Regions:
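Positively charged, polar, low-complexity stretches
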Residues: 1, 59-64, 73, 152, ...
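Catalytic cores of nucleic-acid endonucleases
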Residues: 17-62
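Hydrophobic transmembrane alpha-helix bundles
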Residues: 19-31, 76-87, 142-156
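A conserved mid-domain beta-alpha-beta active-site/ligand-binding segment of alpha/beta enzyme cores
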Residues: 67-138
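Acidic, metal-dependent phosphodiester-chemistry machinery of nucleic-acid enzymes
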Residues: 130-164
Length: 164
């Protein structure tokens, strides 16, 4: 879930789910998200805290007639393991290019995505990046991304040919 100042991971475990994959999921979520939350059915409510770190929030969901009631068992806390470099890797190349533009950075068109991410990390404070990542994700348009990436690649190829 994208928030103005954070990206939150939400894992859902229904009453029919097991904990088999949860350890790997927790590890993955901890790398990318500023806060994490697990939503569980009532059968998991008593034991879920044994399976997620103390900074994870816990919500239970219970069917109540034709609706669902949610109860907060534990509020989420900031994730101490989030890796801003991994968080940046969620962004598509045109989104990274926009962050470079916002921060008046060189374009590095001929360089890899990893190179660009490293340069952004050197130049832009984490607090600024956190807000900019959220804004890029808010603006993301999944219906036009193929067109956006194709246009970005054409522009990159065209502009790089002038550098020769």
């Amino acid at each position: 879930m994208v928030l103005p100042d954070a990206v939150a991971g939400i894992e859902i475990k229904s009453d029919a789910d097991t904990y088999v994959r949860l350890k790997r999921q927790v590890s993955d979520y901890n790398r990318y998200y500023d806060t994490n939350l697990v939503v569980v059915g009532s059968t998991h409510a008593l034991h879920i805290a044994d399976h997620v770190p103390a900074w994870w929030g816990i919500l239970t969901a219970e069917k109540a007639g034709s609706t669902v009631d949610f109860y907060t068992l534990r509020e989420p806390a900031p994730n101490p393991k989030v890796d801003i470099k991994r968080k940046l890797s969620i962004l598509w190349r045109p989104e990274l290019a926009h962050i470079q533009e916002l921060n008046k950075m060189p374009k590095y068109r001929e360089k890899s995505k990893a190179f660009v991410i490293d340069k952004i990390l050197l130049k832009v404070p984490k607090e600024t990046l956190t807000l900019q990542i959220s804004e890029e994700l808010f603006q993301r348009d999944y219906t036009s991304i193929e067109e956006t990436i194709t246009e970005y690649k054409k522009k990159k190829k065209h502009l790089c040919s002038y550098d020769l």
